[in-house]
């Protein structure tokens, strides 16, 4: 488990991070929830529950202790919020790609300079509180691909993910499984939505 950026008693903190093309972070988790807001580039987030693609202007929400790995395409500029899971009772409970609203984007930018300790009732506290409110209502986007349960399909998906630059033809993959392309399409649709 990675060390978190939150100081004791801190509800959230924001960190600006840039990643070069091709960078990867191996599987890890955090004690805090995490919102990764992508400003440029593309990020693929992999968890045991599936994969999420996060383009610019979007974010990915990761609940506390979610094991995840990251793969970066293009020069990625990101703003990452680390959020105390107890800061709000109704924070999202599952990994999801979300739309970063213009209000949330500006609040994230404003939160970059907020220290761990700040005056109660001041501007910094109001920004933090408003971010926490906005996290509860982020629009969810359908940019995930769950892993299939069927072991044959899961093996095919893992092979394709590991060799993403290869050109896979539906009929070729289907024949390796001993089924038709149409059957493969139906099974994949049934398993992954």
Regions found by a protein language model. Name each.
Residues 161, 166-193:
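Basic/polar phosphate-binding segments, predominantly the helix-turn-helix DNA-binding elements
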Residues 49-64:
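Short acidic-glycine-tyrosine-enriched beta hairpin
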């Amino acid at each position: 488990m990675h060390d978190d950026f939150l100081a004791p008693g801190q509800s959230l903190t924001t960190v600006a991070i840039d990643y070069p093309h091709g960078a990867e972070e191996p599987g890890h988790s955090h004690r805090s929830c995490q919102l990764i807001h992508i400003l440029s580039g593309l990020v693929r987030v992999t968890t045991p529950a599936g994969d999420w693609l996060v383009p610019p202007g979007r974010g990915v929400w990761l609940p506390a202790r979610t094991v995840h790995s990251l793969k970066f395409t293009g020069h990625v500029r990101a703003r990452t919020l680390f959020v105390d899971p107890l800061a709000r009772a109704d924070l999202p409970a599952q990994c999801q790609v979300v739309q970063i609203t213009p209000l949330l984007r500006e609040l994230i930018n404003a939160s970059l300079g907020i220290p761990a300790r700040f005056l109660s009732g001041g501007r910094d506290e109001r920004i933090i509180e408003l971010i926490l409110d906005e996290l509860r209502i982020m629009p969810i986007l359908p940019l995930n691909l769950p892993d299939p349960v069927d072991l044959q399909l899961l093996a095919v998906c893992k092979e394709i993910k590991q060799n993403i630059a290869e050109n896979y033809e539906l009929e070729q993959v289907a024949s390796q499984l001993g089924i038709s392309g149409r059957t493969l399409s139906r099974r994949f649709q049934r398993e992954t939505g």
